[in-house]
Amino acid sequence: MTDRFELVSPYSPAGDQPAAIDKLVANFEAGLAKQTLLGVTGSGKTYTIANVVQQVQKPTLVMAPNKTLAAQLYGEFKSFFPNNAVEYFVSYYDYYQPEAYVPSSDTFIEKDSSINEHIEQMRLSATKTLLSRRDSLVVATVSAIYGLGAPEDYLSLRLILSIGEHIDQRQLIRHLTDLQYTRNEFELTRGAFRVRGEVLDVFPAESDTEALRIELFDGDIEQLTLFDPLTGETLRKLQRYTVYPKTHYATTRERTLSAVDTIKEELKERLEQLYSQNKLVEAQRLAQRTQFDLEMMAEVGFCNGIENYSRHLTGKAPGEPPPTLFDYLPPDALLVIDESHVTIPQIGAMYKGDRSRKETLVEFGFRLPSALDNRPLRFEEWEARSPRSIYVSATPGPYELRESAGEITELVVRPTGLIDPVVEIRPVGTQVDDLMSEVHERIKLGDRVLVTTLTKRMAENLTEYLGEHGIRVRYLHSDIDTVERVEIIRDLRLGKFDVLVGINLLREGLDMPEVSLVAILDADKEGFLRSTGSLIQTIGRAARNLRGKAILYADKMTRSMQAAIDETDRRREKQVEYNLEHGITPKSVARPISDIMEGAREDAAEKKAGKGRSKSRQVAEEPADYRAMGPAEIAGKLKALEQKMYQHAKDLEFEAAAQIRDQILKLKAASLA
């Protein structure tokens, strides 16, 4: 373990990268608060940021606009910094239905959610890392601006253990219970502990592969050992270990009882208001619901919807912002906003949507006014908490350009020598027939095609029409969940189909080097789907291929089209000039086709079998060349596969377990051969 970032990469900065890295680092070290990295598709923005992180040596938070992009970034940074703490912090809900009230139909919708334990573990690991290591890089979504437990409580509750320390076993068990760990003598699961004589086994909530064994002798800690909870194998012995709370929302008994008193005071004031307004039904409803919650908190320390009382539990004043992931960041940290033209507006929108729903709940007596303070940060609060920042985008928005005050670092020249796609304009009248002929040409070359339409209906009709004419085509739309969307993009790259039709394909920002043609239908219809930024982003989808071309079907030239074409031409001119000057021959990007979500420690967002729509999923891994593996690699692979097999069997997924068993047998046979 090291406290310094160590970048591991088979290549060195090239093209515009060296100058961009030097400028970003110099600005950061000079104390510049905001700057923008304008990088075209395929220019190595992530690699550039990784070099900046290594040079400035500061804890880093990278914000992405969605889970899919966050998973991709997590995987990339993990490969760049294999010896450092790269973490993943996104919403842990597989499914979330917030509580709401619809006055027009007098309908109350109860909160309903499904928590993904794997992502919860990764969130806990992220906060622990930020508090304990300087070489920490956390990839997060907009989930970072939502309320968490206060870091002061989180730190004050932690259990610090050292060899030779005197501690009573009962006191130790009580402390673990305060951390919300549960005692389970039959099965050691994450967030649980068991007692065997003077030996305590604890499975830390933020870990997925290591458990802690505490061996006591006559009230003294004799030995601290990390072991594999599946096999019992000893991994290493320790001198000191810190156990962090099982949840970010853990709090002391005293704080909970104090909160009960302040909630009672608020309830009394609110009931007086409702009675004075003659809102008797609302008053009766609020009294009943709140009294039940108070009894639960007094007896067991928590209740359903306890987050609505977070202001009382954290001791904040009315209207004060809640503690968030930003409170866990050290003041000298670096903040990177990826795809900032999407992420920044997202941050601004979160507070307003949450507020309108909760105001209705408060008005009609379902919640106390303090529930309004369980909220995401307002935009100005987020700005105040943000450390020194780098906005990263191919099309920075007006906010980023204004905040950067002219400090724009460009990444236009690609290390591969690839130039931006040729842009052609063709008439709308024959767009479908023209598109079909272009698609056939690309299929002959073994390339893929992206088509963007304006409406769902048009996308569906076009998909059906192309399919009827023998073209292998799929349709990407908003009803498809994150994991399935990633699988569709992977299948496109693998050649399982040739054409992908969608409405807003640019939102992924994913790498698809096999795509050589992007067709934008009805490009002259001004709107957010055909704005300058959207057009540049969509054209950029073909920028990773040597034969890249974008066709805009339009009958008139709009301002957005002209601006997008001018910017693309400007970039092409600079790229061609650089290639001629340095004798570079452009070549297509050869990016391995792997599972993007593997970046988030395997199917992190996948639903458990039996929850939601059942669908087949890949169980066994892709066949590997086992002959090239050494004995240590084979042993590690076997152990990982066995863990997967046992987990599937435990979840009653016997077919999946059998597939992995067969893979284990093949690997064992290959190792013997």
UniProtKB/Swiss-Prot annotation:
Residues 601-626 are annotated as: Disordered. InterPro entries: Helicase/UvrB_N, Helicase_ATP-bd, Helicase_C-like, P-loop_NTPase, UVR_dom, UVR_dom_sf, UvrB, UvrB_inter. Residues 635-670 form the UVR domain. Residues 431-597 form the Helicase C-terminal domain. GO terms for cellular component: cytoplasm; excinuclease repair complex. Residues 26-414 form the Helicase ATP-binding domain. The keyword Nucleotide-binding applies. One of its GO terms (biological process) is nucleotide-excision repair, DNA damage recognition. Its main location: cytoplasm. CDD domains: DEXHc_UvrB, SF2_C_UvrB. NCBIfam families: PRK05298.1, uvrb. Forms a heterotetramer with UvrA during the search for lesions. Interacts with UvrC in an incision complex. This is UvrABC system protein B. The gene is uvrB.
